[in-house]
A protein has these predicted regions:
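DNA-dependent DNA polymerase catalytic subunits
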Residues: 2-228
Length: 228
């Protein structure tokens, strides 16, 4: 920089350059949205590479806890592994996910405006947000089944979880919310849609990254693989 300052007749040499990150691998989804496998950050050298995620909201507070860990490990594998290794890991996560109870795979949310969306002739009004709809259904069937002594009704401002349900089911609905535990008395555990939960909590966030590098989330049959 001293030589450059002389060449441009600078009054004083005040140019400096700081090293931000040195990485051996990176994936960009858009401007200022990327994942880096960083070995050196602002002059600090690491013995093991660290993941730097910028502008990619894949892991949110609304992500079920098991998927947060799974996504972090998946991103690390993206930086060091192959497409086949990532696909194998996704299948492993899918199998493990189905063994978690609804209380762990439900989407955490807060709930408000219960009275606003409560229906007069129906349980809820048209256009009710899914987490609120699940809460109104919970309150209705807890009361209908005389379970109010065991489970508190969901109130405005409470933190809840909600799960998608497979249809058909006896409730004829595709969602249920709950505060801590999904009441076994409602007989809905067997109707929890684990495939849809996994799709929205894990696959959709990771597909944003994989699509940028042309990788798949599962193996697809091709003519080449058919004849091999």
């Amino acid at each position: 920089y001293q030589a450059l300052a002389r060449n441009v007749n600078a009054y004083a040499q005040k140019m400096i350059m700081k090293r931000e990150n040195i990485a051996d691998r990176g994936i960009w989804t858009a401007k200022k949205r990327y994942i880096l496998n960083v070995w050196d950050s602002e002059g600090v050298r690491y013995e093991q590479a660290k993941l730097k995620i910028m502008g990619i909201e894949a892991i949110k507070t609304s992500t079920p806890a098991p998927c947060r860990t799974m996504l972090k490990d998946a991103f690390k594998l993206l930086m060091t592994g192959t497409e086949d290794e990532v696909i194998d890991y996704i299948e492993k996560c899918r199998s493990e996910f189905k063994n978690f109870p609804p209380e762990e795979v439900g989407f955490p949310r807060s709930v408000n405006n219960l009275q606003k969306y409560k229906g007069v002739s129906d349980i809820y009004n048209k256009g009710t947000p899914i987490n609120v709809r699940g809460a109104l259904l919970f309150n209705h069937y807890i009361k209908k089944n005389n379970l109010e002594h065991k489970y508190s009704a969901i109130q405005n401002g409470e933190k809840i979880r909600f799960c998608y349900l497979k249809t058909p089911n006896w409730m004829h609905e595709n969602v249920i919310s709950y505060i801590q535990d999904l009441p076994k008395e409602l007989d809905l555990h067997k109707h929890v849609d684990y495939d849809l939960q996994f799709e929205k909590a894990f696959l959709e966030p990771i597909k944003v990254i994989l699509n940028c590098i042309g990788w798949e989330t599962e193996r697809k049959n091709t003519l080449e693989s058919f004849f091999s």
